[in-house]
Amino acid sequence: MVETKPKPTEVQKKKTLYEVMFKSREFIIDVYLRFDCFIYLILGGFGFYQPSNLITLLNYSKSDLGLFNNTDSSISNNNNNNNNINTEEQYSTYDNNLLDNQNEFQIDNNNNNNNNEFIPLYQNPILISVVTMYTLMVSLVAIFQCLISLLALIQKEKSTKSILINLSLTLNFFLLLFNTYVLSTQSEIFSKFAYMGLIVSYIISLLDFSALFFLTSKHKSVLSVISSIFSFFLMCLKVRPKLPKLPKLNSNNNNGNKKKK
């Protein structure tokens, strides 16, 4: 007897949202890569536009003490030669390049009568230089991710496109590890507002990584690379140098005595 297939119902005829997303996965990936490219371009451009703006997010107070100043006058940015301070005599232990940067900052000493004064931490040029370098480094990473997303959009070969997507996922994974370390151990260096913003950005980056990973679930090389790295370290921990076994002197002597008897 020939089995007759049941007619599909109206519910079965309707395409579910999952089926639509599954069939148009490549289109959704392209749209998502465009979104990533736009976001990373904004982040990188903002970092290059104001690289020292991150210092406003640090946890400091105006009572923090920074660079030592042993004069009653203030550091000014005036172009008059008569009002310039001889920075070489005040900061003999610092490099000449840093000494030139001192003229960009001004300290109000009108209310202080002591001879020994300090530059507050938020006006310390060394701290500002370090924060600026860190911001530029993060901006370079954002621009690099923008270029990866752009190249993945341009490429037509699936193999090259998958390699670029895996590279972006790997970079996002290590950035998540770094942000996890900052949130767990270095949270006290940020103000409360900046710390909440850091948590929000961490959640957004985690959602970004999860969305891109599940959209490209066929590309599992990231997990294989990570698992291989962890397995290698575990193997290194388990391996012990095998030393040659020394002969047991007591057992050999006892056997020799028995043979003589």
Swiss-Prot record:
Parts of the chain that traverse the membrane: 38-58, 134-154, 163-183, 195-215, 219-239
Primary localisation category: membrane
GO CC terms: membrane
Record membrane topology: Multi-pass membrane protein
Domain of life of the source: Eukaryota
Subcellular location(s) per record: Membrane
Keywords: Membrane, Transmembrane, Transmembrane helix
Record protein name field: Uncharacterized transmembrane protein DDB_G0293304
